[in-house]
């Protein structure tokens, strides 16, 4: 049984404990509190944060890749790399592709989930495409966008061994809407995204069971005061959790502030939507035959269209705190607690009884140490 005592500025849902400790035993948090008030096991290994922040591990519900590693080609490599960016859990995410390629990718990710590679935990799979609107494909290949097929999805879920946890759909494209209750009954979290839905269409989808929104504001019919669209429904309905990309370019910090004011921190989930170029130096790259430009924050085509983010969740956390102006408590709720709640997992907060997924973070938002279920999976040199 491994035991650890982590000392530092401990960030709990109730606030910051300036001289706090987290006791970890057998993969779970055994105790959290002021150092003077917590009984420390004498045989525990001490990990001193040297006054730096001890935060819950971040959870990314939407990531395609980083460091030239993609969810399609090497999801185990993705899991290994993410703890360097304060991420302890994630949903590898697939966009639109041919039925054969989608099936193969799903099968390979499911096999990796089963083997449980070292690093950040794969918490399931996010199928962002192909069941989206041809009017709002974003950076997806429009050729592969197609209407929802119950038969195809069941084959994909079987190949995934039941690991498809999150499914993005455009509910206004028939026949997607009619299958929402059945998907929810199977335990799938249904999200609206890449959608041209009107306000009424979006609200009807929410009534049927949609409870999540994929990268709100992006690749979705924009808000208009005479036709609020899906964005209006997402902002208004308390039962919908909204993903937001935190690179400061996909969504202006002021828009993120408005989103949090409308829904509260408990209604927002930070995501990266990071692409395989994330983590690489700014510059010009060629990926799958396309020229792409990265400024280190976001990735664009030469003509300026956004195709994905180059910012991981630790960078998104910086955006929430330094540009949006949120408190650390609010920012960590959005980056850790809400994603954990969406997935129904006992993590995302530094509380006794929860999984010991935590990070020692320096003032530059870089992890000094990342722990997943009580195992140190990354430690800075």
Regions found by a protein language model. Give the residues of each.
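N-terminal metal-binding scaffold of metallo-dependent hydrolase/deaminase domains
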Residues: 1-40, 371, 376
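Active-site metal-binding motif and surrounding structural segment of the metallo-beta-lactamase
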Residues: 37-54, 158
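Metal-associated gating/positioning segment near the N- to mid-region
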Residues: 49-105
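Conserved, mostly hydrophobic/aromatic
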Residues: 51, 62, 127, 183, ...
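Active-site gating loops and adjacent loop-to-helix segments of metal-dependent hydrolytic enzymes
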Residues: 57, 80-91, 133-161, 203-216, ...
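Active-site mouth loops of central-metabolism enzymes
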Residues: 61-73, 139-146, 189-193
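Active-site core of metal-dependent hydrolases
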Residues: 154-280
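His/Asp/Glu-enriched, well-ordered alpha-helical/loop segment
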Residues: 232-243, 248, 260-272, 277-361
